[in-house]
Amino acid sequence: SGGFDFSFLPQPPQEKDGGRYYGVGLGPGPMGLMGPRGPPGASGAPGPQGFGPAGEPGEPGQTGPAGARGPPGAPGKAGEDGHPGKPGRPGERGVVGPQGARGFPGTPGLPGFKGIRGHNGLDGLKGQPGAGVKGEPGAPGENGTPGQTGARGLPGERGRVGAPGPAGARGSDGSVGPVGPAGPIGSAGPPGFPGAPGPKGELGPVGNTGPSGPAGPRGEQGLPGVSGPVGPPGNPGANGLTGAKGAAGLPGVAGAPGLPGPRGIPGPVGASGATGARGLVGEPGPAGSKGESGNKGEPGSAGPQGPPGSSGEEGKRGPNGESGSTGPTGPPGLRGNPGSRGLPGADGRAGVIGPAGARGASGPAGVRGPSGDTGRPGEPGLMGARGLPGSPGNVGPAGKEGPAGLPGIDGRPGPIGPAGARGEAGNIGFPGPKGPAGDPGKAGEKGHAGLAGNRGAPGPDGNNGAQGPPGPQGVQGGKGEQGPAGPPGFQGLPGPAGTTGEAGKPGERGIPGEFGLPGPAGPRGERGPPGESGAVGPSGAIGSRGPSGPPGPDGNKGEPGVVTAGPAGSGGLPGERGAAGIPGGKGEKGETGLRGEVGTTGRDGARGAPGAVGAPGPAGATGDRGEAGAAGPAGPAGPRGSPGERGEVGPAGPNGFAGPAGAAGQPGAKGERGTKGPKGENGIVGPTGPVGSAGPAGPNGPAGPAGSRGDGGPPGMTGFPGAAGRTGPPGPSGITGPPGPPGAAGKEGLRGPRGDQGPVGRTGETGAGGPPGFTGEKGPSGEPGTAGPPGTAGPQGLLGAPGILGLPGSRGERGLPGVAGAVGEPGPLGIAGPPGARGPSGAVGPGVNGAPGETGRDGNPGSDGPPGRDGLPGHKGERGYAGNAGPVGAAGAPGPHGTVGPAGKHGNRGEPGPVGSVGPVGALGPRGPSGPQGIRGDKGEPGDKGPRGLPGLKGHNGLQGLPGLAGQHGDQGSPGPVGPAGPRGPAGPSGPAGKDGRTGHPGAVGPAGIRGSQGSQGPSGPPGPPGPPGPPGASGGGYDFGYEGDFYRA
């Protein structure tokens, strides 16, 4: 906030000793009042660099009252690089600031790869209707044998090492192996046959930890690269054991299930960094491949795979190996050449802070007048109140890289702050594109399982196999031991920066209220309609690279930053169909399905030919009509008697069991037609005579007229079963009668042969996602494992969110300027006291912070205890209320080292004034050099498990089975009553997976999640107009020199 010095312009010529000389003053002029910023002018081209040695700096001008803050101006052009000055003395230890805001949620550990759920088999083709007689409902069939479990595919080649993942949990001890070069992405080999699980071997002893090598110099930061395109998905690897359940993410839009990306290498846990402003979230890069784990003992050479054995018992756990001693710290780096000494600045006197001036109206830019004589420096004005921090300006082009300055004195590491609260769960990753599907192969005959041979070289990429039916869920394995921490991954290339939006007007700051007690959980709200996804903004241009500072030792790793999911990509085109996989193993029996609707009655079978006509018996006397008795079982048909009068239709009896079909007989000879006899009258019914012997069958007489309908007689006795008549040629189909009442369920029939695999059916549409499941009970925590030796320092983490601004304190009295003292050596650090118990956080008070105490020394790390056995995974508990904020944490690690400025003259050190209250948080300073690595802190408490994730999407229907064989033509039976629905029939064989269905409708919006983390700082506002020029500065002094007869003053 100073005036502009225009004294470098050529002055009017003045006579001296017969020649002319021109003044070229280079000192800053006195600081004028800061007017409102004018509109942003266009960036002019940089002028040519002036000549002549640098003049003495002028006296500093008065500090005028601060004007109202205008909008930020346009980014200026980068000036020439100044000479690096001497390193400043290490600053005094600052007051411990308030505890930073809750850390951003760490990315939840990737869950173990869950077995991909197989698609449901498509419904089988409807069998052709049998031409046989409609019989009783058949017995429910047995469940069909599920297909064999698909072979476990050979694992693909290891992918390249991707960008480093977020900081994982602290790993156990183990020697850190060197990072190998990234191998090329290999193609997946053909699927092998699955071997039976072998016996579980005993765990070998943990190897000794090797000595740590010297810390190498830090490499220069590479230029930011553009994110490459997402590569094609790799072949799915074998299903791993079920891992520990990670925290559940917010429910996303139900997409097609993507291939799980490999897991990044967990870096060592660093000390808590100072909470800075949150950076803009970049676009998510492609998921990196899983890095290599550290070497754990030398593995023996792999022998050929033996025949499948039975599952062995769990072996005993081996003894823990001894922790290796930490190696010596590497030698310090070579001291850099000292930079050129900067010009000394003039001693300025600090002015008193004055009140903030009101913002004046922007006046028109006046015409520039001639430069007046240089006035004497005025008395320092009152310093205005500290304004609100301005928005960060646009990044200007990078200047040329200056020479490296002298390395500063290493500061001692501060005390490690308390562990931050566990962050919220990250977003669910977007699914990857689905691979192409191949044509289904014909099912071959199952051969004997041969012995697995040695592993061959990986073949070319095969098509993705079809999804097999879901196998039985395996028993959840115990929690594996934590492996050694791998080396820190390479720093990923930064993604392109987004365009800077307009900054909102800063609102007035409200008074922070007291913390209220958490209220009871409200009722669950109804789901609102799903909102539309916002459009992705265009990517901004990549800024130029800044000059690299001197390489410092690696700093402590900060807390993991937030990984936000980018917008969902458009659904990919469905790939080609994959080749049919080996049929999967037998699945578990499914539950009995709901009863389907009653189908339409089938057509009646062809009517059989009439049997031979028997001789008519004598007519019996008409008795009283008796009540209908229960229908007995139907016996075989007897010989056909003479036709009587048509009786009333009786009620339908229960269906009898269908007997075996008789052999088809030859059609009989056609009888001759008899002569038509005279119509007789009805005679008086005589007494019943004795039954005579049956006479020979006579020829059929002509049909007489229909007689009157008689009353129904009493039920007759069941006669002896007659001989079965031959089956005649089929007659025409009769009229279908109404369906009768349902009969009792029949017995279970014999199991039919397995049908051949049918053609691929159409892909069904994807159903909507189900509601989220209920949260289970929380299980007991397992015993903590042993702490390992300090790991190597990881890359610097992202800056945390800014803390809450404190109330401005009262201004202290102005101190008298003292005489400049020599730079003192830093005093020794005190011993750190034991950490106190964590108490509840109180309300923010208006008190003044006390003076900072001395930093204690770090204690020696305790010896590691043996790791405890893993407990059984318990039921997941309900998520608790958010706890109260913890106490104020210790100051974080020093920020990055900034560019060294020219060293000024040593000012007089004033008497320390009273400590004021913490003012508003200023803009982030440049990063200082990292101090030496501190002793590793204690392992943090594990956080609560997140809520249970959403259920997976329903798989596709399976393939339709082949139509069944047509039934044989049986005799026509009477339509029986419709029986109740039998139990669910056997599942048909699973065919190859169908093509991908269309994307389902997005599910309903889930309940509101927990309040997210603090938002990032908004983009900077538009540049403001430049202010008016200040008065000219005092002459900087100089000397005369001649050039071609003219004198110049430098």
UniProtKB/Swiss-Prot annotation:
Using the UniProt annotation, give all residue ranges assigned to the region (Disordered): 1-1050
Q: Name one Pfam family in it.
A: Collagen
- Positions of transmembrane segments: none
> Per the annotation, which location comes first and is thus the protein's main one?
secreted
Q: Which compartments is it annotated to reside in?
A: Secreted; Secreted, Extracellular space; Secreted, Extracellular space, Extracellular matrix
Q: What is the recorded post-translational modification?
A: Prolines at the third position of the tripeptide repeating unit (G-X-Y) are hydroxylated in some or all of the chains.
Q: Residue ranges under compositional bias (Pro residues)? A: 1020-1032
- The biased composition feature labelled Basic and acidic residues covers 78-92, 670-679, 936-947
- Drop me one GO molecular function for this one: extracellular matrix structural constituent conferring tensile strength
Similarity comment: family membership: Belongs to the fibrillar collagen family.
Miscellaneous: These protein fragments were extracted from an ancient rib bone collected at Bariloche in Argentina and estimated to be around 19050 years old.
List the PANTHER family hit by this protein, alphabetically: COL_CUTICLE_N DOMAIN-CONTAINING PROTEIN-RELATED, COLLAGEN ALPHA
Q: Which protein, by its recorded name, is this? A: Collagen alpha-2(I) chain
> Which organism does this record belong to?
Megatherium americanum
